[in-house]
Swiss-Prot record:
Primary role: This reaction introduces a second double bond into the aromatic ring system.
Protein name according to UniProt: Chorismate synthase
Residues reported to bind FMN: R130, S131, S132, N251, A252, G296, K311, P312, I313, P314, T315, R337
NCBIfam families listed in its UniProt record: aroC, PRK05382.1
Recorded GO CC terms: cytosol
Lineage: Bacteria, Bacillati, Bacillota, Bacilli, Bacillales
Molecular function GO labels: chorismate synthase activity; FMN binding
Membrane-crossing residue ranges in chain numbering: none
Species of origin: Geobacillus kaustophilus (strain HTA426)
Length: 388
């Protein structure tokens, strides 16, 4: 399974083409729209989310509510495009006023300058329109399709926020993934700990008041993945490596860890590795899950636990210093409409990209063409592991 996306932040639409999704999967627009609505929520979002109400159009690969096995085409309209039709026109324009609106002041922390150097753009709008986090809209749409695959084989995915602006959640004593999801869906910052959630909102308010931005840490948990998914044979087949790449590919994400993560560097081996246990009811398992569900790039059967670090959004209403690429004079960086904090929304994006990688691994390992055969093969793998 793979997907490609196309479209600019203020262009007419965003598009995703999904290849390799098995035939026979029940899929409706409402499955995807539910995830798109979750992405648009979150304390600290900017005015753009008041303009857009993201809804998907499925224009290929689905008939009568089921996937066909052919490529799936997903389209999400940018409603704000009506205000940008001249600036984002496909054909050449001769409107001098619009030409003068080109972006020549790169923003620190963005792809503006690097992208202009790479592609030879003198107007950095050509860079920022595509490097914008608006593109994650269709990545969430693709992830919604992946979640449907995982649901069919009894695999559940949940994401939540564990830190914003230095405020870290301490109360994480949820008894099930369902409880975690129920509580975080009601939290404006998608945090299970209500006391920490309140302090996170206060930190976001402070950032907004001061024209600044703050980042944080999100966690994604995947339960129900059979042992033995992924591979230790080659570096590019390790499932944890694919998930790590997917997490860091999200806009503004700068780090990733599994299980106890970087804490492993500060502990002796006896406090890092998970002891193996066995019972007639469960077969082989682990006493703990410090590895976060992976050993050697292969799933252990324990929950996958992965965290990603999101830096503060670089677009600031109190802009940092930069240099105009035309005049070479120092200026305060350009300001684009932005959020004070997008960590809650980013947890939904992280869910989506992790779901895609896990679903792709399941489809590859247990049969690529038909959903019914994949379900049979996954159940067979679970029985095999239990009886091993």
């Amino acid at each position: 399974m793979r997907y490609l996306t196309a479209g600019e932040s203020h262009g007419p639409q965003l598009t995703a083409i999904l290849e390799g999704v098995p035939a026979g999967l029940e899929l409706r627009a409402e499955h995807i729209n539910k995830e798109l609505a979750r992405r648009q929520k979150g304390y600290g979002r900017g005015r753009r989310m008041q303009i857009e109400k993201d809804e998907v159009k499925i224009t290929g690969g689905v008939r009568h509510g089921k996937t066909l096995g052919s490529p799936i085409a997903l389209v999400v309209e940018n409603r704000d495009f009506k205000h940008w039709q001249t600036i984002m026109a496909v054909e050449p324009i001769d409107d001098e006023a619009e030409v003068k609106r080109k972006v020549t002041r790169p923003r620190p922390g963005h792809a503006d300058l690097n992208g202009a150097l790479k592609y030879g753009h003198r107007d950095m709008r050509n860079v920022l329109e595509r490097s914008s986090a608006r593109e994650t809209t269709v990545r969430v749409a693709a992830g919604a399709v992946a979640k449907r695959i995982l649901e069919e084989v009894g695999i559940r995915v949940a994401g939540h926020v564990i830190e914003i602006g230095g405020v870290r959640a301490k109360k994480l004593d949820y008894r099930s993934l369902e409880e975690l999801q129920a509580v975080t869906e009601e939290s404006p910052v998608r945090c299970f700990d209500p006391e920490a959630g309140q302090k996170m909102m206060e930190a976001i308010d402070w950032a907004k008041k001061n024209g600044d931005s703050i980042g944080g840490i999100v966690e994604v948990i995947v339960e129900g993945v059979p042992a033995g998914v992924g591979s230790y044979v080659h570096y590019d087949r390790k499932l944890d490596a694919k998930i790590a790449a997917a997490i860091v590919s999200i806009n503004a994400f700068k780090g990733v860890e599994f299980g106890i993560g970087f804490e492993a560097a500060r502990r002796p081996g006896s406090e890092v590795h998970d002891e193996i246990i066995w019972s007639p009811e469960q077969g082989f398992s682990r006493r703990t899950n410090r590895a976060g569900g992976f050993e050697g790039g292969v799933t252990t059967g324990m929950p996958i636990v992965v965290r990603g670090v999101m830096k503060p959004i670089p677009t600031l209403y109190k802009p940092l210093q930069s240099v105009d690429i035309e005049t070479k004079e120092p200026f305060a960086a350009s300001i684009e409409r932005s959020d004070s904090c997008a960590v809650p929304a980013a947890s939904v994006v992280a869910e989506a990209v992790v779901a895609w990688e896990v679903a792709a691994a399941i489809v590859e390992q247990f049969g690529q063409d038909r959903m019914d055969l994949i379900k049979e093969n996954v159940e067979r793998a679970r029985r095999y592991a239990k009886e091993f």
